[in-house]
Structure formats: structure tokens, C-alpha cells
Design a protein with these regions (language model features):
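Alpha-helical scaffolding within the catalytic cores
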Residues: 3-13
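Acidic catalytic loop of the alpha/beta-hydrolase fold
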Residues: 6, 26-35
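Extracellular/periplasmic catalytic domains that process cell-envelope and extracellular macromolecules
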Residues: 13-16, 57-59
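Short beta-strand/loop motif that positions the catalytic acidic residue
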Residues: 15, 21-25
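Short, well-ordered loop/turn elements at secondary-structure boundaries
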Residues: 16-17, 132
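Alpha/beta-hydrolase-fold catalytic nucleophile elbow
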Residues: 1-2, 23, 69
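Alpha/beta-hydrolase-fold serine-hydrolase catalytic core, especially in secreted/extracellular enzymes
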Residues: 41, 45-230
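Membrane-proximal bilayer-interacting regions
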Residues: 16, 34-38
Length: 230
């Protein structure tokens, strides 16, 4: 990327489990791109401190965000590919962070091994999943944004405060595979601290067909799923 974006439009949480490169000209002042990039850098640094490692002991927020001295909107993109090529995709992270939000009237229907069957409200929803052994812990919250800084000329929303409250009334499908849990043993699932499932999860052809139709991803054809209401 070469220009900052208000974080309400691109929550940094959704960039966990990947390498993220973001270079912007230090003098790229159009639409406050340089300022917004500095806010993005601060957010990634904060998330890295709050979540240094995933449940499977992997760095969660690997990022390189810099303002390039003396540059405006035109920058040299050549350093990006050598930096990114050191990372490999992990389709089965044991920690997932996801802020589900409206994008021009549409929502994603799923993220990694989660599929939303019913949203808890019209608000944004934050999902945090951690898998330790055969215990899956889900934290699901409603997210409310409050704008704390606006540009005085165009009214661009620049900076935000996020308030979280426990979400209720939703339904989520949790897909599982051997890379995430031991399917030969019982699985325990908690949502917002409450046990919602305990027992063995049965593999089925239906799960494979359903996940294939949902994700269109050969790495995410899951043998089992559980539907969970909260």
C-alpha cells in the first residue's frame, strides 16, 4: 500500500497471521495519507504488544510500516516483494482475530475457519478465537466506534475509539480439522466464558461440501463443523 486509510475502513486486527508491508511517502499529504499511515503504524505496534504470539506460538502481527523520507505519492515499490517473500501462508492459525463490518452494504460470510450464520446485531462484530489443545475459546463482542478526530476541511474521520460489549443473539459455524484439534478426542468449546459444547465432533461429507462452497479454498475443505448459538 502507498497511502494511509482511516482504520475504520480497514481494521488492523484482520491482518493477524500474515506479513503486512505498508510504505508511504513522508511528504504524501494528500487526504492525510502520511498522517493516516502513522496512525496505522501505531495501531499495529499496539496490537503486536497486546498479542505478541498466537496460541500456537507464532508471531501474530508481523509488519513493516514506514514513512519514506523525501517522497510524496510516488514511491519505490521494489523493496516490498523481497520483504513479503519471507512469509508463508498459514491457513490453520490457532488464534484468529476478525472484525466483521459492513463494506458497501455487504459482509464477509466467513473468515479462516469461522462462518457467520446469524449476526448478533447490526453493529460491527469482533471475533477472537484461541485454540489450546482441544479447547476452543471464542470471544464475540459488539463493536461501537466513536470518532475522536476529524479533518476540519473535508470532515474525513481520522481517529477512533472502539468500545466493546459482549455480543448475544448470534450463531456461528466453527469448522475443525486435524491441524486445529485432535478429532479422535473430545472437544470443548466456550463462547464468552460459557461452555457451549463438549464432546466428540463427527466428520461428515456434508462438512466438506459446505466448507468447499463457503470458502472455495482447497486448504479449507474441513471434515467437521459445529453450529453454535450464543
Amino acid at each position: 500500500m502507498a497511502g494511509g486509510e482511516p482504520l475504520k475502513n480497514a481494521p488492523a486486527d484482520n491482518c493477524a497471521n500474515m506479513g503486512f508491508s505498508f510504505l508511504t511517502g513522508a511528504d504524501d499529504m494528500g487526504f492525510y495519507r502520511n498522517v493516516l499511515t502513522s496512525y496505522t503504524q501505531a495501531m499495529f505496534d499496539s496490537l503486536q504488544l497486546a498479542h505478541p504470539l498466537s496460541a500456537d506460538k507464532q508471531p501474530l502481527f508481523r509488519h513493516r510500516i514506514n514513512l519514506v523520507p523525501g517522497k510524496q505519492h510516488h514511491i519505490d515499490y521494489r523493496p516490498t516483494t523481497p520483504w513479503l517473500k519471507q512469509f508463508s501462508r498459514n491457513p490453520y492459525p490457532k488464534t484468529v482475530l476478525w472484525e466483521d463490518f459492513d463494506m458497501d452494504g455487504r459482509h464477509r460470510s466467513g473468515f479462516y475457519n469461522l462462518q457467520v450464520l446469524a449476526r448478533p446485531s447490526d453493529n460491527r462484530t469482533n471475533y477472537e478465537m484461541n485454540i489450546n489443545g482441544n479447547h476452543v475459546d471464542l470471544r464475540i463482542s459488539d463493536v461501537k466506534y466513536t470518532t475522536v478526530q476529524k479533518d476540519p476541511q473535508w470532515g474525513i474521520e481520522m481517529k477512533f475509539y472502539r468500545d466493546y460489549s459482549e455480543a448475544t443473539g448470534g450463531k456461528v459455524r466453527l469448522y475443525l480439522c486435524e491441524q486445529l484439534v485432535d478429532l479422535s478426542k473430545p472437544v470443548e468449546i466456550t463462547i464468552n466464558g460459557k461452555k457451549v459444547f463438549s464432546g466428540k465432533v463427527k466428520a461428515s461429507l456434508q462438512s466438506m461440501v459446505s466448507s468447499c462452497a463457503e470458502y472455495f479454498d482447497p486448504c479449507r475443505v474441513y471434515p467437521a463443523y459445529i453450529d453454535l448459538a450464543y
